[in-house]
């Protein structure tokens, strides 16, 4: 099977994110519309229902370096969150602690990562963890 070039993959993701074609509880788009490298993205996750995250909107930054999609993106929460696998000081997501990042496959996408993080928020061991005040940020 032919390998889809990085920019084609990212342009597909940009179109999907801009048109809202994916899961409605997650969104993503370029940080700067003039970014011809398609490297820096903003994203949001709506907190899952029946958890301490319900009715919260979490902001994240995603960086796709030159190795994406062969390597996973670098994901950082802007909104403060108490979640295993997220550094409590910086908001950086530890790629060894989140399933889809740890077992990254080229066909995964930024949406895959956002949905996996949402799944972690809703898991029985995490859905009741005390959270920082709503609206607080890492930086």
Curated annotation (Swiss-Prot):
Keywords: Ligase, Ubl conjugation pathway
GO cellular component: cytosol; nucleus; ubiquitin conjugating enzyme complex
Disulfide cross-links: none
Biological process according to GO: postreplication repair; protein K63-linked ubiquitination
Gene Ontology MF terms in the entry: ligase activity; ubiquitin conjugating enzyme activity
Function in brief: Has a role in the DNA error-free postreplication repair (PRR) pathway. Lacks catalytic activity by itself. The ubc13/spm2 heterodimer catalyzes the synthesis of non-canonical poly-ubiquitin chains that are linked through 'Lys-63'.
Similarity remark: Belongs to the ubiquitin-conjugating enzyme family.
PANTHER family given in the database record: UBIQUITIN-CONJUGATING ENZYME E2
Name of this protein: Ubiquitin-conjugating enzyme spm2
